[in-house]
């Protein structure tokens, strides 16, 4: 029987390789990417496959323990850490945002609101703000952290952050994604659960999607998301 750590590492590296290959060969997705029903269908299939792989690897051990599917040890600790993640992302945005353009590089969010395609945009938004955070938190902060913590808490946090960033296949956004991923891993390590991270992650994506079509510059999306976390998150 293969080690769950070997299988997880192999999957993350393969996914990262695929993400960067697609990015460098095909470039950015079209601006109407989130207004398409085909995007909704494709993303659902993708996350279903990832979830099945996570479920399968987790089944090689104590699945609920590996995925950290349990009640957080402390809600108040989650509040403080959530605020800390917000402050950290604000600082990172101010220091690196002028040089790096993470939102522009990813190119997923549209520049304008198209009411004729509102239903498709909302459907894609549900996938990005609900399905994606659940699956990604289970993959990285659940399974990944549980398998890597044997090497130490901080190495696990850093490795989870880096692997999370690599999986997105971006260059300029890499520092932001790695910091966000590591912050969520730290949150998971402190509250011993993936549930608070799912909420923070979901809020981040939801606010980004909302800000993208509100007329505000995309360069400020990360700033807006980070500033809103403490007020909106129940954790």
Which positions does each model-derived feature cover?
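Alpha-helical transmembrane segments in multi-pass membrane proteins
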Residues: 3-61
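Hydrophobic alpha-helical transmembrane segments
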Residues: 5, 9, 40, 76-83, ...
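Alpha-helical transmembrane segments of multipass membrane proteins
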Residues: 14-19, 46-50, 85-93, 204, ...
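Functionally important transmembrane alpha-helices
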Residues: 18-20, 157-167, 171-232
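Juxtamembrane helix-loop-helix connectors linking adjacent transmembrane helices
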Residues: 25-39, 62-132, 217-235
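Membrane-interface starts of transmembrane alpha-helices
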Residues: 30-45, 119-124, 152-160, 193-196
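Hydrophobic core segments of transmembrane alpha-helices in multi-pass, intramembrane catalytic enzymes
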Residues: 45-50, 124-128, 176-184
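Membrane-interface helix/loop boundary segments of multi-pass membrane proteins
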Residues: 75, 135-159, 186-193
């Amino acid at each position: 029987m293969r080690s769950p750590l070997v299988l997880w590492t192999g999957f993350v590296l393969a996914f990262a390789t695929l993400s960067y290959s697609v990015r460098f060969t095909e470039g950015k997705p079209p601006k109407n990417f989130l207004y398409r029903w085909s995007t909704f269908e494709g993303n659902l299939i993708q996350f279903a496959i990832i979830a099945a792989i996570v479920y399968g690897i987790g089944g090689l051990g104590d699945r609920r323990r590996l995925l950290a599917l349990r009640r957080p040890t402390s809600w108040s600790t989650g509040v403080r850490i959530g605020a800390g993640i917000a402050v950290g992302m604000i600082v990172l945005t101010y220091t690196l945002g002028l040089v790096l353009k993470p939102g522009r590089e990813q190119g997923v969010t549209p520049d304008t609101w198209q009411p004729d395609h509102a239903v498709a945009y909302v459907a894609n938004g549900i996938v990005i703000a609900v399905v994606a955070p659940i699956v990604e938190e289970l993959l990285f902060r659940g399974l990944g952290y549980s398998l890597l913590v044997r090497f130490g808490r901080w190495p696990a946090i850093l490795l989870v952050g880096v692997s999370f960033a690599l999986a997105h296949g971006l260059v300029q956004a890499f520092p932001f994604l790695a910091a966000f991923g590591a912050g969520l891993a730290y949150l998971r390590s402190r509250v011993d659960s993936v549930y608070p991270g799912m909420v923070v992650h979901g809020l981040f994506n939801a606010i980004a999607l909302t800000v993208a079509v509100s007329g505000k510059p995309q360069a400020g999306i990360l700033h807006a998301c980070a500033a809103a976390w403490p007020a909106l998150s129940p954790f």
